[in-house]
Amino acid sequence: MIKILNANEVEPDWFTGRNFTDANEVVQEVIKDVIENGDAALKKYGAKFDVSAPASFLIAESDLKAAAEKLKKDHPETYDAVCYSHELAFKFASRQKDSFDDFEMEIAPGMFTGQKTIPVERAGVYVPAGRFPLVSTVVMTVTPAAAAGVDEIVMCTPPRVHPDDKAKAEAAGLGVPGKPFAGGKPYADEGIMAAAYICGCKKVYACGGSQAIAGMAYGTESIPQVDVIVGPGNKFVAACKKAVYGKVGIDMVAGPTEVFIIADSSADPAWVAADLLAQAEHDVVAQPVMVTTDRGFAERVSAEIEKQLETLSTAQTARQSIDACGKIIIVDSLEQAAEFANRKAPEHLELAMEE
């Protein structure tokens, strides 16, 4: 059950609690291995952590195209939604780019200064595909890079068994967690492949985890070195992005996903509970948090969470997140709620209130 706390019971460390101590040592070894052994290291970690350890990494463009065509045929509404999302994101990113004014000025006689905004040559995108492949991440990372005019967009995403290899893998009882199918063709989640094709990314590598981040940061025989790496991931991906910062640029150290909802009694407890669970189902260490001044409302949301967990298909993951990392915090005022939000600086901030 989600914890209900008074404001004075919240530990100060919680506000800055993106702690990757247990992951740092692991990723340092991964980075060292990738630098020294390149593709061989990527294959070693793929065989250890993924359901597939392909013989090579670059997914054929024909497979990307086929995935997009399959999505259009089998799930036309989803296909249209991805296309529309790409269109909207491209418009917004293009407007952002236009807002960066280039200029030159003579600040003193004979002394000229200025500003010129240019895209990086090669951007690396990481798209998770663990419990839930994140098609939306493709749109939110690839599309801005395309709008910015990046010459080459490289994507890494965890491997899957290629359709051509599925019968062989199934016959051998392979291609499942703990029993990877090795040596097949590179492939990935079909939704991610389809979205990559729709958004214009044609270089997709079947490589996941911290080893993919290290591969993009330092380059291997197969994966080119990039200038900047963007995209979310688990704590090992986040720790690796933090470790390679300086060698390459990064967007941010995101860590486990989180939502922070400021709500009052005018909100529907069922809706608030659903939003908390929508984040909780991502990861067992996701942080679903609600802040309110009304303890009665907090208890109604807590009860609604328990009710919805009974029928949630992702309840196993969501339950662990809610019990271990979930919080409902009772504050004295909305001003204190805003203060907590500013201190936490969450990935997702939601206001569910009348005013």
Residue locations for each model-derived region?
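Conserved C-terminal structural/oligomerization subdomain of aldehyde/semialdehyde dehydrogenase
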Residues: 322-355
